[in-house]
């Protein structure tokens, strides 16, 4: 039984398959007891609910928003000029407390802009980040940033690590998350000026920092929080999505190639279906924002009803974890950590002790 908490606001007009697939996903979640605020043009959404034969007993309420942010709209301008757009209205519902979280498969830049404009950032947060929860061999790992900040400074990576550790602990449920920076090797000498500066600071942070990890470690589960800039993170995620799709296709072709393989394929179908489900991006549903004063999830633009339903469940779980309350405290030491690292780097090395061999 779901504990009493404010509904999840769902942007019914965001995504390639809106509003039909979005409404269906919301209905599926509502049928499992999750209260929903469906946001968009009221008349159109009521028609959609009727088309999907959603009964009046379901915990779904329609909240009118008269404008829509298109995929080619400039995010900042859309938030300022289309003040009644469904993304912004979702965030206003979160800010007012009428919604516990929001989900949108719409323009991701507009979702980020709306979060900053409407919710604002916790004290001390330089830039928000987007998290991806990865299906690892051991549980789950989280990767951030996924594209919110492509040109990072050391303080951004430090804060991503601190915020990601909070999310892994409070939402994912990892008691003591291992945190690493994504680099081209595990040695301290690897990486760039950016990663080395952030790593030097994080070695003295109040978390379990394990240094660098490599791309091969993304899905092993050996590291719980993997930190990188938004450009690298986005490329890494898209590469994993593409690889999973190609590997799945290879397996299907191989199992269909001969009669013996076909029999083997039938015998292994359950295992393959389990693997496919584990790697299916729709199972994750959406990518949470961290570093704003509220819970927001960005779903893939091509999300179907399955993805939206899962995003709603995950948004609900994140809201119940109250992780946002801890973010300001987590990032508070970030400036001091960087200053301390810079001070240590500037110190001259200790003088070499004389030995009998020097004589």
Curated annotation (Swiss-Prot):
UniProt pathway annotation: Lipid metabolism; phospholipid metabolism
Q: Which InterPro entries match?
A: FA_synthesis (IPR003664), Phospholipid_synth_PlsX-like (IPR012281)
Q: Which GO terms describe its molecular function?
A: phosphate:acyl-[acyl carrier protein] acyltransferase activity
Cellular compartment(s): Cytoplasm
- Keyword hit for Chloroplast: no
Q: Which domain of life is it from?
A: Bacteria
Assembly information from the UniProt record: Homodimer. Probably interacts with PlsY.
Q: What is this protein called?
A: Phosphate acyltransferase
Q: Lineage of the native species?
A: Bacteria, Pseudomonadati, Myxococcota, Myxococcia, Myxococcales
């Amino acid at each position: 039984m779901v504990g009493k908490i404010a509904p999840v606001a769902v942007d019914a007009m965001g995504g390639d398959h809106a509003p039909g697939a979005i409404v269906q996903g919301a209905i599926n979640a509502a049928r499992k007891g999750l209260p929903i605020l469906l946001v968009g043009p009221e008349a159109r959404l009521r028609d959609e609910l009727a088309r999907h034969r959603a009964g009046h007993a379901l915990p779904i309420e329609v909240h009118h928003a008269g404008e829509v942010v298109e995929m080619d709209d400039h995010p900042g301008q859309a938030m300022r000029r289309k003040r009644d757009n469904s993304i912004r209205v979702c965030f206003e519902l979160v800010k007012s407390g009428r919604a516990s979280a929001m989900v949108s498969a719409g323009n991701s830049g507009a979702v980020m802009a709306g979060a900053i404009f409407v919710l604002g950032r916790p004290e001390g947060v330089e830039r928000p980040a987007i998290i991806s929860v990865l299906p690892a061999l051991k549980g789950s790992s989280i990767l951030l940033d996924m594209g919110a900040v492509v040109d990072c400074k050391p303080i951004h990576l430090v804060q991503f690590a601190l915020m990601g550790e909070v999310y892994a602990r409070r939402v994912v449920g990892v008691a003591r998350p291992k945190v690493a920076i994504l680099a081209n090797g595990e040695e301290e000498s690897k990486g760039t000026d950016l990663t080395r500066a952030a790593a030097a600071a994080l070695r003295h942070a109040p978390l379990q920092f394990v240094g660098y990890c490599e791309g091969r470690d993304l899905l092993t589960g050996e590291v719980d929080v993997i930190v990188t800039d938004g450009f690298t993170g986005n490329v890494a995620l898209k590469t994993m999505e593409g690889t999973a799709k190609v590997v799945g296709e290879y397996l299907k072709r191989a199992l269909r190639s001969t009669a013996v393989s076909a029999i083997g394929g039938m015998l292994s179908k359950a295992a393959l279906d389990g693997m496919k489900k584990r790697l299916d991006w729709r199972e994750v549903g959406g990518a949470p924002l961290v570093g704003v004063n509220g819970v927001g999830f960005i779903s893939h633009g091509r999300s179907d009803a399955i993805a939206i339903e899962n995003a709603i469940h995950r948004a609900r779980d994140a809201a119940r974890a109250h992780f946002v309350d801890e973010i300001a405290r987590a990032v508070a030491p970030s400036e001091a950590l960087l200053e301390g690292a810079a001070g240590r780097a500037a110190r001259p090395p200790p003088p070499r002790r004389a030995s009998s061999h020097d004589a």
